[in-house]
């Protein structure tokens, strides 16, 4: 990886951990320290405003950084069992479409993975994605004649990872593990959730999502399941 690439990843790590630490310090000061000094009611009155402000800051951070941070925000927006509506409502905007990566960068990434020019693998390939997500995006394409004859079909959807996403996932998870370690030392948070365990589960599913061979295998297994039928009971003769 180039020196600028390393600098971007280091900056990314610092921004994520700085945000995490700032939220932890805010919780420590307003929800632990001030209530012990007789200012519990004053602290409580400002809680909604603080939560909303923190959610807005995270949404902006996730939108700017992209990658796994978008998925973190999408995941948190569904946790209405753990987070107040001020947070989940703000983060729900991250469920919308994600801006697509530049096709020139995607082409380089795809050709490196395939080991051949895209023009050799495909008779045609759209340059505008039909879907863009935090970790990858998809394009309509037609297989080259020889490959189409071998496969038995020509029209395909090509799913390509965002350039450099594997390194981004590694860095983001490293930052999230650091933050989870800090949160595990905050008693009332640790009593409510095993944050390090949640991060590890999130890491497992994230790595599965960027393992397209694993995904292809799962798609094959799902397709094979549809080849079978099960007995259908008839109530009138039962």
Segments the model singles out, each with a brief description of its role:
Residues 1-137, 147, 173-197:
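N-terminal accessory/targeting segments that precede structured cores
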Residues 146-154:
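Short, solvent-exposed loop/turn segments that connect beta-strands within catalytic domains
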Residues 155-160:
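Glycine-rich ATP phosphate-binding loop
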Residues 163-186, 205-226:
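A conserved alpha-helical element in kinase catalytic cores
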Residues 191-210:
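Non-catalytic, low-complexity flexible loops and terminal extensions
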Residues 228-235:
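Conserved small/polar residues in nucleotide/adenosyl-binding loops
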């Amino acid at each position: 990886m180039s020196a600028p690439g390393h600098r971007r990843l280091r900056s990314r790590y610092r921004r994520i951990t700085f945000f995490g630490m700032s939220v932890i310090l805010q919780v420590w000061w307003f929800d632990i320290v001030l209530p012990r000094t007789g200012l519990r009611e004053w602290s409580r009155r400002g809680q909604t405003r603080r939560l909303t402000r923190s959610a807005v800051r995270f949404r902006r951070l996730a939108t700017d950084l992209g990658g796994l941070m978008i998925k973190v925000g999408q995941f948190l927006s569904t946790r209405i069992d753990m987070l107040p509506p001020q947070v989940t409502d703000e983060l729900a905007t991250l469920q919308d479409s994600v801006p697509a990566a530049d096709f020139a960068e995607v082409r380089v990434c795809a050709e490196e993975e395939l080991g051949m020019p895209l023009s050799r693998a495909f008779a045609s390939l759209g340059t505008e994605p039909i879907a863009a997500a935090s970790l990858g995006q998809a394009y309509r394409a037609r297989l080259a004649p020889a490959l189409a004859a071998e496969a038995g079909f020509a029209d395909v959807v090509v799913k390509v990872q965002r350039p450099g996403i594997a390194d981004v996932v590694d860095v983001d998870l490293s930052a999230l593990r650091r933050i989870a370690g800090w949160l595990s030392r905050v008693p009332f948070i640790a009593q409510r959730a095993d944050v390090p365990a949640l991060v590890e589960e999130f890491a497992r599913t994230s790595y599965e999502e960027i393992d397209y061979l694993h995904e292809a295998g799962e798609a094959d297994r799902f397709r094979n399941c549809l080849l079978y039928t099960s007995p259908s009971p008839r109530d009138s003769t039962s």
